[in-house]
């Protein structure tokens, strides 16, 4: 599924994301996954991969097998569904631990300017 910008904003609100950080989250998602829930990235230099709307990494956060594991206690395939509840819970856990530093897409594109969501 690909969200529109406002569709993403509405879904993130539904998932309980902090309104004060909403533009950061939208920017992160737009730069990491282009708002696609099922995106699997190319292999990273360290051999890991990133999954889903928030591009969550399998080195630390999700398990590649069929048994949920790692720090979010989920399988990576659970991060690829149109229902973003599991992915959102994991993304918020990552944020709580590292702020936005875990995401190069945020670091490279969102640190100083964020998208306009005032019409949403």
UniProtKB/Swiss-Prot annotation:
Keywords: Antimicrobial, Bacteriolytic enzyme, Disulfide bond, Glycosidase, Hydrolase. Residues 1-120 form the C-type lysozyme domain. Gene3D superfamilies: 1.10.530.10. GO terms for molecular function: lysozyme activity. Monomer. Lysozymes have primarily a bacteriolytic function; those in tissues and body fluids are associated with the monocyte-macrophage system and enhance the activity of immunoagents. Belongs to the glycosyl hydrolase 22 family. PANTHER family: LYSOZYME C. This is Lysozyme.
């Amino acid at each position: 599924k690909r969200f529109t910008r406002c569709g993403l904003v509405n879904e993130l609100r539904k998932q309980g994301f902090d309104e004060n950080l909403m533009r950061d989250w939208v920017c992160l998602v737009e730069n990491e996954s282009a708002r696609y829930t099922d995106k699997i990235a190319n292999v990273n230099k360290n051999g890991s991969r990133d999954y889903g709307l928030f591009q969550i990494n399998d080195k630390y956060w999700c398990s590649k097998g069929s048994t949920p594991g790692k720090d979010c206690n989920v399988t990576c395939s659970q991060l690829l569904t149109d229902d973003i509840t599991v992915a959102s819970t994991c993304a918020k856990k990552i944020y709580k631990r590292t702020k936005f530093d875990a995401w190069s897409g945020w670091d490279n594109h969102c640190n100083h300017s964020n998208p306009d969501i005032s019409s949403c």
